[in-house]
Design a protein with these regions (language model features):
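Long, charged alpha-helical interface segments
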Residues: 1-56
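C-terminal subdomains that position terminal phosphate/3'-OH groups for nucleotidyl transfer/ligation
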Residues: 28, 45-226
Length: 226
């Protein structure tokens, strides 16, 4: 995955029949069709390789490239299962990815980013439609107040999969701008003197969340996209 063209490695594995025994979840994506924005049908396996190829041009990070490659493994068996809700589909996606990571003993950094990305990328692309409480939950999951690295890696993954033909190339940039602004607003909330305000223990966290929700509500009303 750290080579200049990691998608070629996957192609060669499949060409010589080695992908199926090593990565059956990925191999099963080939032959599964999805509809492009131009209404043409396209193969999910090749879509994953295109996303990987373009992600490799965005980032040299192994965890980012891996997360993009395996973000939608459930699509290989989705047609064979009764999934009555988005939550069941999400559960399947995450459980398949966890099984792959366990079986292949995937390094921790790769595992954490890929699972977090698989769990939240669909919500990310709907960020502007989320009510404040769900928006706060999303930014808490994809960012870390002590470091920008977690969110930047997540955003790189989003940019990578937005180039597979299913989404507009600008979709990740628009959602990224919105979520980044929301993160900055949420992180700006502080309580200077909890004792003076009569707060202690869990009350401090609850008050911070209350203030964050109020600021995010105002943010949603006024966000211009600039």
């Amino acid at each position: 995955l750290l080579e200049e063209s990691p998608h070629i490695f996957i192609k060669v594995l499949r060409q010589y029949g080695a992908l199926k025994p090593l990565f059956p979840e990925l191999d099963q994506l080939f032959g599964v069709k999805y509809r492009l924005q131009n209404h043409q049908d396209f193969d999910r396996g090749y879509g994953a390789l295109i996303a990987l190829e373009k992600t490799a041009k965005l980032s040299q990070s192994g965890p980012v490239r891996f997360a993009v490659l395996v973000h939608s493994l459930e699509e290989s068996i989705i047609a064979d299962r009764e999934l009555s809700s988005k939550s069941k589909r999400l559960d399947l996606r995450v459980s398949m990815l966890k099984s792959l990571c366990d079986r292949l003993k995937i390094p921790r950094k790769y595992r954490e980013l890929s699972i977090n990305f698989a769990r939240h990328y669909k919500t990310f692309f709907l960020a502007q439609q989320l009510e404040p409480r769900k928006l706060l939950k999303l930014i808490s999951a994809v960012s870390d107040k002590s470091s920008t690295c977690k969110f930047e890696n997540f955003l790189l993954c989003c940019e990578g999969i937005s180039r597979d033909g299913q989404r507009d190339d600008n979709e990740a940039l628009i959602s990224g701008r919105y979520v980044r602004s929301a993160i900055n607003i949420a992180n700006s909330v502080v309580i200077a003197s909890p004792k003076r305000d009569g707060l202690q223990g869990r009350e401090i966290g609850q008050e911070i969340q209350k203030l964050q929700l109020a600021k995010l509500t105002e943010f949603k009303k006024n966000f211009s996209g600039r």
